Design a protein with these regions (language model features):
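Alpha-helical membrane-interface segments at transmembrane helix boundaries
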Residues: 4-12, 16, 37-41, 45, ...
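Hydrophobic transmembrane alpha-helical segments of multi-pass transport and channel proteins
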Residues: 48-56, 306, 310, 335, ...
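Hydrophobic transmembrane alpha-helices and their membrane-interface caps
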Residues: 1, 326-375, 416, 443-446, ...
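Transmembrane alpha-helices and their membrane-interface boundaries in multi-pass membrane transporters
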Residues: 12-31, 36-77, 374, 428-465
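Short, membrane-interfacial amphipathic segments enriched in basic
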Residues: 74-85, 280-284, 386
Length: 487
Protein backbone atom coordinates (compact mmCIF):
# COMPACT_ATOMS: atom_id res chain seq x y z
CA UNK A 1 0.00 0.00 0.00
CA UNK A 2 2.82 2.38 0.84
CA UNK A 3 4.54 1.64 -2.48
CA UNK A 4 1.33 2.39 -4.38
CA UNK A 5 0.84 5.60 -2.43
CA UNK A 6 4.43 6.61 -3.13
CA UNK A 7 4.05 5.92 -6.86
CA UNK A 8 0.90 8.04 -7.07
CA UNK A 9 2.44 10.90 -5.10
CA UNK A 10 5.65 10.81 -7.18
CA UNK A 11 4.30 10.48 -10.71
CA UNK A 12 0.62 11.44 -10.40
CA UNK A 13 1.07 15.11 -11.27
CA UNK A 14 3.61 14.37 -14.01
CA UNK A 15 1.25 11.83 -15.55
CA UNK A 16 -1.58 14.35 -15.34
CA UNK A 17 0.40 16.98 -17.24
CA UNK A 18 1.57 14.53 -19.90
CA UNK A 19 -2.03 13.43 -20.46
CA UNK A 20 -3.17 17.05 -20.60
CA UNK A 21 -0.57 17.90 -23.25
CA UNK A 22 -1.48 14.82 -25.31
CA UNK A 23 -5.19 15.63 -25.00
CA UNK A 24 -4.43 19.21 -26.07
CA UNK A 25 -2.78 17.94 -29.24
CA UNK A 26 -5.98 16.11 -30.18
CA UNK A 27 -8.33 18.82 -28.89
CA UNK A 28 -6.96 21.36 -31.38
CA UNK A 29 -8.82 19.47 -34.14
CA UNK A 30 -12.03 20.90 -32.67
CA UNK A 31 -11.33 24.27 -34.32
CA UNK A 32 -11.02 22.81 -37.84
CA UNK A 33 -14.77 23.29 -38.52
CA UNK A 34 -14.82 19.82 -40.05
CA UNK A 35 -17.55 17.73 -38.44
CA UNK A 36 -15.57 14.49 -38.56
CA UNK A 37 -12.34 16.03 -37.25
CA UNK A 38 -14.22 17.93 -34.55
CA UNK A 39 -15.82 14.71 -33.33
CA UNK A 40 -12.44 12.97 -33.51
CA UNK A 41 -10.80 15.73 -31.45
CA UNK A 42 -13.53 15.71 -28.80
CA UNK A 43 -13.66 11.93 -28.45
CA UNK A 44 -9.87 11.48 -28.47
CA UNK A 45 -9.11 14.23 -25.93
CA UNK A 46 -11.89 13.18 -23.55
CA UNK A 47 -10.85 9.53 -23.86
CA UNK A 48 -7.25 10.36 -22.93
CA UNK A 49 -8.34 12.19 -19.77
CA UNK A 50 -10.81 9.40 -18.95
CA UNK A 51 -8.08 6.76 -19.31
CA UNK A 52 -5.87 8.76 -16.96
CA UNK A 53 -8.60 8.88 -14.32
CA UNK A 54 -9.38 5.18 -14.73
CA UNK A 55 -5.72 4.26 -14.39
CA UNK A 56 -5.34 6.51 -11.37
CA UNK A 57 -8.25 4.88 -9.52
CA UNK A 58 -8.49 1.33 -10.85
CA UNK A 59 -4.86 0.19 -11.22
CA UNK A 60 -3.90 0.91 -7.57
CA UNK A 61 -7.03 -0.93 -6.40
CA UNK A 62 -6.20 -3.98 -8.53
CA UNK A 63 -2.56 -4.00 -7.44
CA UNK A 64 -3.56 -3.71 -3.79
CA UNK A 65 -5.24 -7.12 -4.05
CA UNK A 66 -2.30 -8.72 -5.85
CA UNK A 67 0.73 -10.29 -4.14
CA UNK A 68 4.08 -8.51 -4.01
CA UNK A 69 5.99 -8.95 -7.29
CA UNK A 70 8.56 -11.71 -7.18
CA UNK A 71 12.16 -11.19 -8.16
CA UNK A 72 11.64 -12.84 -11.55
CA UNK A 73 8.94 -10.29 -12.35
CA UNK A 74 11.50 -7.49 -12.00
CA UNK A 75 14.34 -9.12 -13.91
CA UNK A 76 13.58 -7.10 -17.05
CA UNK A 77 14.83 -4.00 -15.24
CA UNK A 78 18.29 -5.52 -14.85
CA UNK A 79 18.75 -6.91 -18.33
CA UNK A 80 22.20 -6.33 -19.79
CA UNK A 81 21.01 -4.57 -22.92
CA UNK A 82 19.12 -2.02 -20.81
CA UNK A 83 22.29 -1.17 -18.90
CA UNK A 84 24.25 -1.04 -22.14
CA UNK A 85 21.70 1.35 -23.62
CA UNK A 86 21.97 3.61 -20.59
CA UNK A 87 25.77 3.53 -20.74
CA UNK A 88 25.74 4.37 -24.44
CA UNK A 89 23.43 7.35 -23.89
CA UNK A 90 25.63 8.60 -21.04
CA UNK A 91 28.82 8.29 -23.10
CA UNK A 92 27.27 9.94 -26.13
CA UNK A 93 25.93 12.91 -24.18
CA UNK A 94 29.12 13.30 -22.16
CA UNK A 95 31.75 12.94 -24.87
CA UNK A 96 30.02 13.53 -28.20
CA UNK A 97 27.87 16.60 -27.64
CA UNK A 98 29.49 18.38 -30.59
CA UNK A 99 28.57 15.46 -32.84
CA UNK A 100 24.99 15.63 -31.54
CA UNK A 101 24.74 19.36 -32.25
CA UNK A 102 26.35 18.95 -35.67
CA UNK A 103 23.96 16.14 -36.57
CA UNK A 104 20.98 18.21 -35.42
CA UNK A 105 22.07 21.25 -37.45
CA UNK A 106 22.76 19.17 -40.58
CA UNK A 107 19.43 17.37 -40.28
CA UNK A 108 17.68 20.71 -39.77
CA UNK A 109 19.32 22.25 -42.85
CA UNK A 110 18.58 19.22 -45.02
CA UNK A 111 15.00 19.13 -43.71
CA UNK A 112 14.40 22.79 -44.53
CA UNK A 113 15.46 22.10 -48.13
CA UNK A 114 13.04 19.16 -48.21
CA UNK A 115 10.22 21.25 -46.74
CA UNK A 116 10.36 23.62 -49.72
CA UNK A 117 9.75 20.61 -51.98
CA UNK A 118 6.48 19.65 -50.28
CA UNK A 119 3.36 20.11 -52.38
CA UNK A 120 -0.08 20.72 -50.92
CA UNK A 121 -2.14 18.40 -53.06
CA UNK A 122 -4.41 15.40 -52.96
CA UNK A 123 -6.98 13.62 -55.06
CA UNK A 124 -10.32 12.01 -54.47
CA UNK A 125 -9.26 8.37 -54.89
CA UNK A 126 -5.47 8.30 -54.42
CA UNK A 127 -5.76 6.94 -50.86
CA UNK A 128 -8.20 4.20 -51.82
CA UNK A 129 -6.97 0.57 -52.12
CA UNK A 130 -5.64 0.02 -55.64
CA UNK A 131 -6.68 -3.66 -55.71
CA UNK A 132 -10.34 -2.98 -54.91
CA UNK A 133 -12.91 -3.66 -57.63
CA UNK A 134 -14.45 -0.20 -57.42
CA UNK A 135 -11.01 1.35 -58.08
CA UNK A 136 -10.86 -0.52 -61.41
CA UNK A 137 -14.39 0.68 -62.16
CA UNK A 138 -13.39 4.29 -61.52
CA UNK A 139 -10.34 3.93 -63.76
CA UNK A 140 -12.55 2.48 -66.51
CA UNK A 141 -14.97 5.40 -66.35
CA UNK A 142 -12.09 7.86 -66.34
CA UNK A 143 -10.55 6.35 -69.46
CA UNK A 144 -13.84 6.01 -71.33
CA UNK A 145 -15.65 9.18 -70.23
CA UNK A 146 -12.68 11.44 -69.41
CA UNK A 147 -13.61 11.95 -65.79
CA UNK A 148 -15.80 10.99 -62.85
CA UNK A 149 -16.01 14.21 -60.81
CA UNK A 150 -18.58 16.74 -62.04
CA UNK A 151 -17.45 20.32 -62.55
CA UNK A 152 -20.27 22.78 -63.17
CA UNK A 153 -20.33 26.41 -64.22
CA UNK A 154 -23.43 28.25 -63.02
CA UNK A 155 -24.50 31.23 -65.15
CA UNK A 156 -26.89 33.97 -63.98
CA UNK A 157 -27.90 36.28 -66.83
CA UNK A 158 -29.71 38.66 -64.41
CA UNK A 159 -32.82 38.76 -66.62
CA UNK A 160 -35.63 36.43 -67.66
CA UNK A 161 -35.04 34.40 -70.82
CA UNK A 162 -31.52 35.79 -70.91
CA UNK A 163 -29.97 32.35 -71.44
CA UNK A 164 -31.59 31.84 -74.83
CA UNK A 165 -30.31 35.15 -76.17
CA UNK A 166 -27.97 34.48 -79.05
CA UNK A 167 -25.19 36.60 -77.50
CA UNK A 168 -25.31 34.50 -74.32
CA UNK A 169 -25.26 31.25 -76.28
CA UNK A 170 -22.22 32.43 -78.24
CA UNK A 171 -20.39 33.34 -75.03
CA UNK A 172 -21.19 29.91 -73.57
CA UNK A 173 -20.01 28.23 -76.78
CA UNK A 174 -16.63 29.99 -76.61
CA UNK A 175 -16.24 28.92 -72.98
CA UNK A 176 -17.03 25.33 -73.95
CA UNK A 177 -14.35 25.46 -76.64
CA UNK A 178 -11.79 26.29 -73.93
CA UNK A 179 -13.03 23.40 -71.75
CA UNK A 180 -12.66 20.97 -74.67
CA UNK A 181 -8.98 21.95 -74.98
CA UNK A 182 -8.27 21.02 -71.33
CA UNK A 183 -7.22 17.31 -71.32
CA UNK A 184 -8.34 16.71 -67.72
CA UNK A 185 -11.94 17.70 -68.55
CA UNK A 186 -14.56 15.87 -70.57
CA UNK A 187 -16.62 17.42 -73.35
CA UNK A 188 -19.07 19.87 -71.70
CA UNK A 189 -22.83 19.48 -71.83
CA UNK A 190 -25.18 22.48 -71.82
CA UNK A 191 -28.07 24.12 -73.61
CA UNK A 192 -25.59 25.11 -76.32
CA UNK A 193 -25.19 21.48 -77.38
CA UNK A 194 -28.97 21.05 -77.45
CA UNK A 195 -29.42 24.12 -79.67
CA UNK A 196 -26.65 22.93 -82.02
CA UNK A 197 -28.20 19.46 -82.26
CA UNK A 198 -31.58 21.05 -82.94
CA UNK A 199 -30.21 23.01 -85.87
CA UNK A 200 -28.49 19.92 -87.23
CA UNK A 201 -31.74 17.94 -86.92
CA UNK A 202 -33.68 20.74 -88.61
CA UNK A 203 -31.37 20.39 -91.62
CA UNK A 204 -31.90 16.61 -91.83
CA UNK A 205 -28.90 15.70 -89.67
CA UNK A 206 -26.30 17.33 -91.88
CA UNK A 207 -23.09 17.48 -89.72
CA UNK A 208 -22.01 20.83 -91.15
CA UNK A 209 -25.04 22.46 -89.48
CA UNK A 210 -23.92 21.42 -85.99
CA UNK A 211 -23.53 25.05 -84.92
CA UNK A 212 -25.44 27.84 -83.28
CA UNK A 213 -28.27 29.34 -85.32
CA UNK A 214 -27.91 32.67 -87.01
CA UNK A 215 -30.03 35.64 -85.95
CA UNK A 216 -32.56 34.79 -88.67
CA UNK A 217 -32.73 31.11 -87.64
CA UNK A 218 -32.81 31.74 -83.91
CA UNK A 219 -36.56 31.87 -83.25
CA UNK A 220 -37.73 28.82 -85.18
CA UNK A 221 -34.67 26.71 -84.19
CA UNK A 222 -35.34 27.38 -80.50
CA UNK A 223 -39.00 26.50 -80.86
CA UNK A 224 -37.88 23.31 -82.60
CA UNK A 225 -35.59 22.53 -79.65
CA UNK A 226 -38.42 23.05 -77.16
CA UNK A 227 -40.65 20.63 -79.05
CA UNK A 228 -37.88 18.08 -79.73
CA UNK A 229 -39.37 15.66 -77.20
CA UNK A 230 -43.04 15.12 -76.50
CA UNK A 231 -42.40 13.64 -73.04
CA UNK A 232 -39.57 15.64 -71.52
CA UNK A 233 -38.59 19.22 -72.06
CA UNK A 234 -34.85 18.82 -72.58
CA UNK A 235 -34.25 22.45 -71.78
CA UNK A 236 -35.13 21.82 -68.12
CA UNK A 237 -31.90 19.84 -67.77
CA UNK A 238 -29.85 22.90 -68.65
CA UNK A 239 -31.82 26.04 -67.76
CA UNK A 240 -34.45 27.00 -65.17
CA UNK A 241 -38.12 27.67 -65.88
CA UNK A 242 -37.59 31.45 -66.15
CA UNK A 243 -34.72 31.16 -68.60
CA UNK A 244 -32.50 33.27 -66.36
CA UNK A 245 -30.12 30.60 -65.06
CA UNK A 246 -28.07 28.03 -66.97
CA UNK A 247 -25.31 25.57 -66.28
CA UNK A 248 -22.42 24.00 -68.15
CA UNK A 249 -21.53 20.50 -66.92
CA UNK A 250 -18.21 18.76 -67.47
CA UNK A 251 -16.41 15.88 -65.73
CA UNK A 252 -12.88 16.05 -64.39
CA UNK A 253 -10.32 13.29 -64.14
CA UNK A 254 -8.94 12.44 -60.71
CA UNK A 255 -6.04 14.89 -60.66
CA UNK A 256 -4.11 16.59 -57.90
CA UNK A 257 -5.16 19.80 -56.19
CA UNK A 258 -2.34 21.71 -57.92
CA UNK A 259 -3.67 20.79 -61.38
CA UNK A 260 -7.22 21.59 -60.28
CA UNK A 261 -6.07 25.07 -59.27
CA UNK A 262 -4.48 25.69 -62.67
CA UNK A 263 -7.63 24.50 -64.44
CA UNK A 264 -9.74 26.77 -62.25
CA UNK A 265 -7.49 29.76 -62.99
CA UNK A 266 -7.71 29.15 -66.76
CA UNK A 267 -11.50 28.84 -66.68
CA UNK A 268 -11.99 31.89 -64.48
CA UNK A 269 -9.69 34.04 -66.63
CA UNK A 270 -11.69 33.04 -69.73
CA UNK A 271 -14.97 33.71 -67.91
CA UNK A 272 -13.78 37.21 -67.00
CA UNK A 273 -13.05 37.90 -70.68
CA UNK A 274 -16.31 36.50 -72.06
CA UNK A 275 -18.90 37.46 -69.45
CA UNK A 276 -19.04 41.12 -68.31
CA UNK A 277 -19.63 41.23 -64.55
CA UNK A 278 -22.28 43.92 -64.87
CA UNK A 279 -24.41 41.57 -67.02
CA UNK A 280 -23.55 38.10 -65.70
CA UNK A 281 -22.82 36.38 -62.41
CA UNK A 282 -20.72 33.25 -62.94
CA UNK A 283 -19.76 30.72 -60.27
CA UNK A 284 -17.98 27.38 -60.28
CA UNK A 285 -19.37 24.42 -58.37
CA UNK A 286 -19.51 20.63 -58.51
CA UNK A 287 -17.73 17.90 -56.57
CA UNK A 288 -14.36 18.54 -58.23
CA UNK A 289 -14.39 22.23 -57.30
CA UNK A 290 -15.73 21.60 -53.78
CA UNK A 291 -13.12 18.89 -53.17
CA UNK A 292 -10.32 21.24 -54.19
CA UNK A 293 -11.59 24.13 -52.05
CA UNK A 294 -12.45 21.83 -49.13
CA UNK A 295 -9.00 20.23 -49.13
CA UNK A 296 -7.22 23.59 -49.11
CA UNK A 297 -9.52 24.90 -46.39
CA UNK A 298 -8.98 21.79 -44.26
CA UNK A 299 -5.19 21.92 -44.65
CA UNK A 300 -5.19 25.59 -43.55
CA UNK A 301 -7.28 24.73 -40.51
CA UNK A 302 -5.04 21.79 -39.59
CA UNK A 303 -1.94 23.99 -39.83
CA UNK A 304 -3.72 26.43 -37.51
CA UNK A 305 -4.51 23.56 -35.13
CA UNK A 306 -0.80 22.59 -35.09
CA UNK A 307 0.17 26.16 -34.23
CA UNK A 308 -2.47 26.17 -31.50
CA UNK A 309 -1.15 22.85 -30.13
CA UNK A 310 2.38 24.27 -29.91
CA UNK A 311 1.04 27.41 -28.23
CA UNK A 312 -1.10 25.53 -25.69
CA UNK A 313 1.69 23.11 -24.79
CA UNK A 314 4.07 26.05 -24.41
CA UNK A 315 1.60 27.57 -21.97
CA UNK A 316 1.54 24.33 -19.99
CA UNK A 317 5.35 24.32 -19.90
CA UNK A 318 5.34 27.95 -18.76
CA UNK A 319 2.81 27.10 -16.06
CA UNK A 320 4.96 24.20 -14.86
CA UNK A 321 8.46 25.73 -14.98
CA UNK A 322 7.77 29.49 -15.06
CA UNK A 323 10.84 30.07 -17.25
CA UNK A 324 10.99 31.29 -20.84
CA UNK A 325 14.37 29.63 -21.39
CA UNK A 326 13.03 26.30 -20.19
CA UNK A 327 10.13 26.64 -22.65
CA UNK A 328 12.59 27.13 -25.53
CA UNK A 329 14.74 24.20 -24.39
CA UNK A 330 11.70 21.95 -24.10
CA UNK A 331 10.36 22.90 -27.54
CA UNK A 332 13.59 22.42 -29.52
CA UNK A 333 13.82 18.60 -29.19
CA UNK A 334 10.12 18.30 -30.02
CA UNK A 335 9.95 20.69 -32.97
CA UNK A 336 13.09 19.29 -34.62
CA UNK A 337 11.51 15.85 -35.28
CA UNK A 338 8.49 17.56 -36.85
CA UNK A 339 10.76 19.50 -39.21
CA UNK A 340 12.74 16.36 -40.08
CA UNK A 341 9.52 14.47 -40.82
CA UNK A 342 8.29 17.34 -42.99
CA UNK A 343 11.61 17.29 -44.85
CA UNK A 344 11.30 13.54 -45.41
CA UNK A 345 7.83 14.14 -46.86
CA UNK A 346 9.32 16.60 -49.33
CA UNK A 347 12.10 14.24 -50.44
CA UNK A 348 9.84 11.20 -50.77
CA UNK A 349 7.09 13.10 -52.55
CA UNK A 350 4.50 12.76 -49.78
CA UNK A 351 2.12 15.71 -50.24
CA UNK A 352 0.53 17.85 -47.57
CA UNK A 353 -3.10 16.78 -47.40
CA UNK A 354 -5.62 16.17 -44.60
CA UNK A 355 -4.41 12.61 -43.95
CA UNK A 356 -0.76 13.68 -43.54
CA UNK A 357 -1.09 17.07 -41.82
CA UNK A 358 -2.81 15.27 -38.92
CA UNK A 359 0.56 13.75 -38.07
CA UNK A 360 2.14 16.84 -36.60
CA UNK A 361 -0.43 17.81 -33.96
CA UNK A 362 -0.76 14.20 -32.78
CA UNK A 363 2.99 13.49 -32.70
CA UNK A 364 3.85 16.78 -31.00
CA UNK A 365 1.26 16.26 -28.28
CA UNK A 366 2.62 12.78 -27.55
CA UNK A 367 6.37 13.40 -27.85
CA UNK A 368 6.37 16.33 -25.43
CA UNK A 369 5.44 13.89 -22.64
CA UNK A 370 9.02 12.59 -22.48
CA UNK A 371 10.32 16.14 -22.18
CA UNK A 372 8.04 16.86 -19.25
CA UNK A 373 9.15 13.71 -17.43
CA UNK A 374 12.82 14.42 -18.02
CA UNK A 375 12.76 18.11 -17.07
CA UNK A 376 10.67 17.44 -13.99
CA UNK A 377 13.13 14.79 -12.83
CA UNK A 378 16.04 17.07 -13.73
CA UNK A 379 14.73 19.82 -11.50
CA UNK A 380 14.19 17.36 -8.67
CA UNK A 381 17.78 16.13 -9.00
CA UNK A 382 19.05 19.72 -8.99
CA UNK A 383 17.40 20.31 -5.64
CA UNK A 384 18.63 16.98 -4.27
CA UNK A 385 22.22 17.53 -5.52
CA UNK A 386 22.47 21.19 -4.51
CA UNK A 387 22.45 22.50 -8.10
CA UNK A 388 25.22 20.20 -9.34
CA UNK A 389 24.41 20.38 -13.04
CA UNK A 390 26.18 17.43 -14.63
CA UNK A 391 25.34 15.08 -11.82
CA UNK A 392 21.67 16.09 -12.01
CA UNK A 393 21.46 15.68 -15.80
CA UNK A 394 22.93 12.19 -15.81
CA UNK A 395 20.93 11.14 -12.76
CA UNK A 396 17.73 12.27 -14.48
CA UNK A 397 18.82 10.53 -17.68
CA UNK A 398 19.41 7.25 -15.83
CA UNK A 399 16.12 7.56 -13.98
CA UNK A 400 13.88 8.43 -16.92
CA UNK A 401 15.82 7.18 -19.95
CA UNK A 402 14.61 3.58 -19.80
CA UNK A 403 10.96 4.57 -19.31
CA UNK A 404 11.21 7.08 -22.18
CA UNK A 405 12.66 4.33 -24.37
CA UNK A 406 9.96 1.81 -23.45
CA UNK A 407 7.04 4.19 -23.96
CA UNK A 408 8.40 5.46 -27.28
CA UNK A 409 8.95 1.93 -28.61
CA UNK A 410 5.44 0.90 -27.55
CA UNK A 411 3.97 3.96 -29.31
CA UNK A 412 6.17 3.33 -32.35
CA UNK A 413 4.87 -0.19 -32.85
CA UNK A 414 1.35 0.88 -31.88
CA UNK A 415 1.15 3.39 -34.72
CA UNK A 416 3.07 1.07 -37.05
CA UNK A 417 0.02 -1.20 -37.06
CA UNK A 418 -1.65 1.33 -39.36
CA UNK A 419 0.83 0.38 -42.10
CA UNK A 420 -1.16 -2.83 -42.70
CA UNK A 421 -4.23 -0.81 -43.72
CA UNK A 422 -5.48 -0.77 -47.31
CA UNK A 423 -6.31 2.94 -47.09
CA UNK A 424 -3.41 5.13 -48.19
CA UNK A 425 -4.14 7.93 -45.73
CA UNK A 426 -4.02 5.55 -42.77
CA UNK A 427 -0.75 4.03 -44.00
CA UNK A 428 0.83 7.50 -44.31
CA UNK A 429 -0.45 8.41 -40.85
CA UNK A 430 1.11 5.28 -39.32
CA UNK A 431 4.49 5.67 -41.02
CA UNK A 432 4.88 9.40 -40.35
CA UNK A 433 3.74 9.35 -36.71
CA UNK A 434 5.94 6.32 -35.95
CA UNK A 435 8.96 8.00 -37.55
CA UNK A 436 8.29 11.29 -35.74
CA UNK A 437 7.96 9.60 -32.34
CA UNK A 438 11.20 7.67 -32.89
CA UNK A 439 13.03 10.87 -33.82
CA UNK A 440 11.49 12.64 -30.81
CA UNK A 441 12.73 9.88 -28.50
CA UNK A 442 16.30 10.29 -29.80
CA UNK A 443 16.05 14.07 -29.49
CA UNK A 444 14.83 13.86 -25.89
CA UNK A 445 17.46 11.28 -24.92
CA UNK A 446 20.43 12.95 -26.64
CA UNK A 447 19.76 16.56 -27.64
CA UNK A 448 17.81 17.68 -24.56
CA UNK A 449 20.52 16.64 -22.02
CA UNK A 450 23.17 18.31 -24.20
CA UNK A 451 21.19 21.55 -24.22
CA UNK A 452 20.88 21.47 -20.44
CA UNK A 453 24.62 20.84 -20.04
CA UNK A 454 25.60 23.54 -22.53
CA UNK A 455 23.31 26.17 -21.03
CA UNK A 456 23.94 25.21 -17.43
CA UNK A 457 25.16 28.64 -16.39
CA UNK A 458 22.16 30.44 -17.82
CA UNK A 459 19.38 28.12 -16.65
CA UNK A 460 20.62 26.22 -13.61
CA UNK A 461 19.92 28.84 -10.98
CA UNK A 462 17.03 29.55 -8.72
CA UNK A 463 16.02 32.72 -10.56
CA UNK A 464 15.64 31.01 -13.91
CA UNK A 465 14.54 27.56 -12.77
CA UNK A 466 12.01 28.73 -10.24
CA UNK A 467 9.90 26.47 -8.14
CA UNK A 468 7.19 25.14 -10.44
CA UNK A 469 3.59 26.24 -9.99
CA UNK A 470 2.58 22.59 -10.00
CA UNK A 471 4.79 20.25 -7.98
CA UNK A 472 5.16 17.72 -10.78
CA UNK A 473 7.49 15.36 -8.95
CA UNK A 474 7.82 15.94 -5.21
CA UNK A 475 11.19 16.16 -3.61
CA UNK A 476 12.82 12.88 -2.72
CA UNK A 477 12.29 11.62 0.77
CA UNK A 478 15.54 11.05 2.68
CA UNK A 479 16.94 7.62 1.98
CA UNK A 480 17.32 5.14 4.81
CA UNK A 481 21.12 5.24 4.45
CA UNK A 482 21.11 9.02 4.96
CA UNK A 483 18.89 8.67 8.02
CA UNK A 484 21.27 6.13 9.57
CA UNK A 485 24.25 8.40 8.95
CA UNK A 486 22.52 11.27 10.73
CA UNK A 487 21.78 9.00 13.68
Amino acid sequence: AKSLQRVISKVGNATLMTNVTTASGFATFIITQSKLLTEFGIVASLSIIAIFLLCLFIIPIIYSFMPIPKEKHLQHLNKQWINQLGDWIDRTVKHHNIAIYSSAVILLAVSIIGIFQIKATGSLIEDMPKKAEFYSDIEFYESEFNGVMPLEIFIDTKRKKGVMKLTTLKRMSKLENLIVEIPELSKPISVVSLVKYSKQAYYNGNPKYFQLPTAQENNFILSYAKNASSDVDLLKNFIDSTGRYARITSFMKDTGIDKMERIEENIISEIDKLFPKERYDISLTGKAYLFQKGTKYLVRNLILSLALAIFLISLFMAYMFRSFRMIIISLIPNLLPLLITAGMMGYFGVPIKPSTILVFSIAFGISVDDTIHFLAKYRQELLANKWAIKKSVFAALRETGVSMFYTSIVLFFGFSVFVTSNFGGTVALGILISATLLLAMLANLLLLPCLLLSLERSIANKKILKKPTLNIIPEEEPRQEDKNRRL
